UniProtKB/Swiss-Prot annotation:
Domain SpoVT-AbrB, first and last residues per copy: 5-47, 76-119
Main subcellular location of this protein, as a coarse class: cytoplasm
Subunit architecture: Forms oligomers.
NCBIfam families: division/cell wall cluster transcriptional repressor MraZ (TIGR00242)
GO cellular component, one term: nucleoid
SUPFAM superfamilies recorded: AbrB/MazE/MraZ-like
A single GO molecular function term of this UniProt record: DNA-binding transcription factor activity
Compartment(s): Cytoplasm, Nucleoid
Listed Gene3D superfamilies: Transcriptional regulator MraZ domain
Designated name of the protein: Transcriptional regulator MraZ
Family named by the database record: Belongs to the MraZ family.
Keywords in alphabetical order: Cytoplasm, DNA-binding, Repeat, Transcription, Transcription regulation
A Pfam family that the UniProt record links to this protein: MraZ
């Protein structure tokens, strides 16, 4: 399971060093793509294949489905971490998420999200403010 919060730096070549505890999970490859709220999603390759299979089931007659697929898949990039656990975040995704040097990487269970640290801090403050109110509706049985 991919969980936790980490604060790596983006190097001058646009590379992210994956947190050591996740490197084995990504050893066979990963897919980086546009994430919602302007972050970068990082899926283990096998997990992304499942996501893609679910997307294929969406009705082609739905404009919302077509739009979502286009935005997600047009920004997708296959990567294989190097021996030091580094992956290059392509310029199009760095621009999408407004990534600079300071990053926040969060585990969300089945994927990682890469955020600009300032953007993450603002997002988290807003999300945390409504956390107590949202739990029963968002995650049945947790409240």
């Amino acid at each position: 399971m991919l969980i936790g919060t980490f604060t790596p730096k983006l190097d001058d070549k646009g590379r992210l060093i994956l947190p050591a505890k996740f490197r084995e999970r990504f050893a066979t490859g990963l897919v980086l793509t546009r994430g919602q709220e302007n972050c970068v999603f990082v899926f283990p390759r096998d997990e992304f294949l499942q996501v893609h299979e679910n997307l294929r089931r969406a009705p082609l007659t739905s404009k919302q489905s077509r739009d979502f697929n286009r935005v997600l898949l047009a920004g997708a990039h296959d990567e294989l971490p190097d021996k030091q656990g580094r992956v290059t975040i392509p310029p199009i995704l760095r621009e999408w998420a407004r990534l600079d040097r300071d990053l926040t990487v969060i585990g969300t269970g089945s994927k990682l999200e890469v955020w600009d640290t300032g953007t993450w801090q603002g997002y988290f403050a807003d999300a945390a403010a409504s956390f107590d109110d949202a739990v029963p509706e968002v995650v049945p049985g947790l409240g």
